[in-house]
Amino acid sequence: MTEHQGVPISPFLRAMPCVLNYDPHFWQRVTSKTKTLIMPIQRPFNLQKWIDENRDLLKPPVSNKNLYVQAGDFIVMIVGGPNARKDYHFNEGEELFYQLEGEINVRVQEDGKAVDVAIKEGEMFLLPANVPHSPMRGENTIGLVIELVRDGRPMQDGLMWFCDECNHKLHEFRFPLRNIETDFQPRFREFYASEELRTCDNCTHVMEMDPRFV
């Protein structure tokens, strides 16, 4: 058995050059106490049947469900609507959107402006990394979203709010994402509970409080 950066390499791992070369943080994940090398092999399932049986999980205030919680590389989510979020999510990795039912709008910050990107049923959209984005989902919409697991990678997520009147940034949180189903809620509550954070430094407009998070 040989070593790589002080970590023993079994013949099994030496047979995986594509994985070792592709992911620069592979060894960090292998040696992490919180990660296993490979998740258990799961059998295929009928996605539409799963959606039909779990629609109650895809409603506010959470609206999303991670399908493979043991996966080490990808978060594979089903996301439902409606939502009424005004925040923008900031991800240092790319995000893949595939719209299964209905049409949604992803508002992005592009060249200092809020720009709407419509994703119709059956359409796919790859959002580049580091683009603030706010998915706006109507009632009876279902979408698939795939993004990178953050744990074991030097990545931080962000939540941002921009003024409704002049698009000036109101506030921003940066944090390591551990659980995509629960980690946003405390930041939502902190922002909406503070009139100071919701007040624009540029035009003095105050964003309305969202009673769901207070």
Listing of model-derived features with the role each one plays in the protein:
Residues 90-109, 143-146:
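Short, conserved beta-strand element in jelly-roll/cupin
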Residues 10, 14, 29-32:
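Low-acidity, Ser/Thr- and Arg-rich intrinsically disordered low-complexity segments
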Residues 76, 87-90, 94-99, 116-117, ...:
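His/acidic/aromatic-lined binding-pocket segments of jelly-roll/cupin-type domains
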Residues 148-214:
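Cys/His-clustered metal-coordination modules, chiefly Zn-binding fingers
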Residues 23-80, 85-87, 186-214:
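A short, N-terminal "cap"/entry segment at the start of jelly-roll beta-barrel domains
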Residues 79, 119-139, 147-148:
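Conserved metal-binding segment of the jelly-roll/cupin
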